[in-house]
Amino acid sequence: MNKLLVSPSPHIHAAVSTKSLMRDVVIALLPAVIVSIVFYGFKELVVLGVSVASCVLIEYLITRYLLKKPSTICDYSAVVTGLLLALNLPYTTPWWVVFIGALFAIGVVKMTFGGLGQNIFNPAIAGRVFLLISFPTYMTHWEMPAGLFGADAVSGATPLGLVKEGLLNEQTVSQVMSESGLSYAQMLFANLGGSVGEISALALLAGFVYLLARKVIKPYITLSIWGTVALVSLIFWLAAPDKFTDPLFNLLTGGMVLGSCFMATDYATSPMSVKGGIVFGIGIGFITLMVRYFGSYPEGMSFAILIMNATVPLLNMWFHQKKYGRK
């Protein structure tokens, strides 16, 4: 009997299974996971372990005992959600907060809508936002990396948080950058406070290149996000460089790389057409910058992705793909 291979839309015209796709995403995330463990130490292992194990267990229990269906945990999608959720959390997050985030991501956001391919919102992003609203103290407490065998870490702030706080204290962006010792090399390679997924843009970009090489994702959503962020931030920066950060800063900090490369490109929660995907990416980039520049939160990537997730049905209707053989 031939084996039917199914994946969430948009469908890939090749014999590629959901399991294979998700396995590639796990492999692509490994550089960031390894760097996070090296820089954050054993506490990060706890966050990663609890997040992945909780997502897998919760999906198994719901599928087998509530939905009365065969288990879907072997397709690796729950593992991907667990890894992405962990990378969106501070490494100091208590294990029970991580578990609640996993319960919301899988139990509410994913399985309530019927499982993989049926969910409207990205589960990992929704889990992070839920925790940010419910447990702001844990989600906004940052410590600088102590290392795998390092001493106790010291409290710190994210680059976006430092700039936001400095501007509120009537400092200029250049003053904040100078006094804090922030450098673009740090942003690209590692050693900054923030969520685990903010530790190294280079490690995340390596995973992104792997996904492109494996043809797991297409680059147009990510590139439209980057292009929008670069263009809009350039306009603001040229108009008032003392008040607004430059394009490179915005491209390398916060959840920009993780969100644009691994979560905005999620098949189930992004548009099916290229035109729809480009509009989707433009919206994410613009909303992210507006939150960063004018919102109360330093970072806006998570909110931007969730907002644009909600527009996907409309974008699919507006930019529907032409049926084969029709003009």
Identify the function of each model-found stretch.
Residues M1-R23, Y293-K327:
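Cytosolic-side transmembrane-helix boundaries in multi-pass membrane proteins
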Residues L84-L89, T93-A153:
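Membrane-interface helix-loop-helix junctions at boundaries between adjacent transmembrane segments
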Residues M1-V56, Y60-T63:
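N-terminal signal-anchor module of multipass membrane proteins
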Residues I120-A124, P247-G254, G277, S296-M308:
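Loop-to-transmembrane alpha-helix initiation sites
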Residues P123-L205:
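Long hydrophobic alpha-helical segments that form multi-pass transmembrane helix bundles
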Residues F42-S54, T92-G101, M187, N191-A201, ...:
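Structural signature of hydrophobic alpha-helical transmembrane segments
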Residues D24-A32, V47-E59, S77-G82, A86, ...:
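Alpha-helical transmembrane segments in multi-pass membrane proteins
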Residues L57-K69, I106-G117, A206-K215, C261-S270:
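C-terminal ends of transmembrane helices
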